[in-house]
């Protein structure tokens, strides 16, 4: 069973939570749901960034014994922000923004560890996609050692569009990839910057790589082919810190 304080049960209750602007990580809906109220739910969901998964009712029953009516919403542990709101705010404050974007990272522990590093390095925000991404729940909060209480998290419909917006706003984009042209410490991290990290199995998607200004790699000197993504992120983040403080 999951902590019930992190969930909302029932179609009407979930509709009201969405309309009230609650930050919701995802919604599980039983596959064969067919009611007027469920149609209202899907209408309300249009235009939101909330991922919806259609699942067997048995899966929902394993999560809770409450009267869920085939619908369970998982409440986010953070209040999501929008990149397009945060960027002008940071520039108005005279900041030299540093963002970290996570492309396809779904492991809560990796996400929490990256968030912790970001907070320690004074990164201005972490950007994640609305779909195929981590669930920012209590486990993520715990793994981050509380960093997610203060670190802004932006959840975006399209990372590609967000990258284009950042480039138009004067950001340089650096991707960590095994296809990198040169080692990570040869890149320029001094200006407005977004570092993009991909999942360990797939890496940064091709569409997103195509928008990056620099592709960098971390040299592997042993027999293992790659680092854990949270470790790799930490290396690039602190290279940025070093260059910005020199």
Model-identified regions with their sequence ranges:
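N-terminal positively charged helical leader segments and presequences
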Residues: 1-89
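Surface-exposed amphipathic alpha-helices with a cationic face
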Residues: 46, 163-167, 241
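Short, acidic/turn-prone active-site loops that include or flank metal/cofactor-
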Residues: 32-33, 57, 131-133, 200-202, ...
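Glycine- and other small-residue-rich loops at beta-strand/loop junctions that grip anionic moieties
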Residues: 6, 30, 103-104, 129, ...
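RNA substrate-binding interface of SAM-dependent RNA methyltransferases
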Residues: 16-23, 34, 88-182
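Active-site/ligand-binding-proximal alpha/beta "capping" segment
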Residues: 174-228
């Amino acid at each position: 069973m999951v902590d019930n304080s992190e969930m909302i049960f029932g179609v009407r209750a979930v509709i009201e939570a969405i309309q009230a602007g609650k930050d919701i990580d995802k919604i599980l809906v039983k596959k064969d749901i067919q009611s007027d109220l469920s149609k209202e739910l899907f209408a309300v969901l249009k235009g939101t960034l909330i991922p919806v998964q259609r699942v067997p009712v048995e899966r929902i029953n394993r999560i809770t014994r409450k009267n869920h009516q085939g619908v369970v919403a998982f409440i986010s542990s953070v209040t999501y922000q929008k990149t397009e709101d945060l960027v002008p705010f940071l520039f108005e404050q005279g900041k030299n923004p540093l963002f970290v974007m996570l492309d396809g990272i779904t492991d809560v522990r990796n996400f929490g560890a990256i968030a912790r590093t970001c907070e320690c390095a004074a990164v201005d925000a972490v950007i994640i996609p609305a779909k195929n991404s981590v669930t920012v729940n209590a486990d993520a909060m715990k793994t981050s050692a509380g960093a997610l209480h203060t670190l802004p998290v932006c959840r975006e419909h399209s990372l590609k569009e967000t990258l284009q917006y950042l480039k138009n706003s004067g950001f340089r984009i650096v991707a960590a990839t095994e296809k990198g042209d040169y080692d990570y410490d040869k890149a320029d991290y001094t200006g407005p910057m977004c570092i993009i990290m991909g999942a360990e199995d797939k890496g940064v998607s091709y569409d997103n790589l195509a928008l990056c200004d620099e592709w960098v790699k971390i040299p592997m000197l042993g027999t293992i082919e790659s680092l854990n993504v949270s470790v790799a992120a930490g290396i690039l983040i602190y290279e940025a810190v070093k260059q910005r403080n020199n």
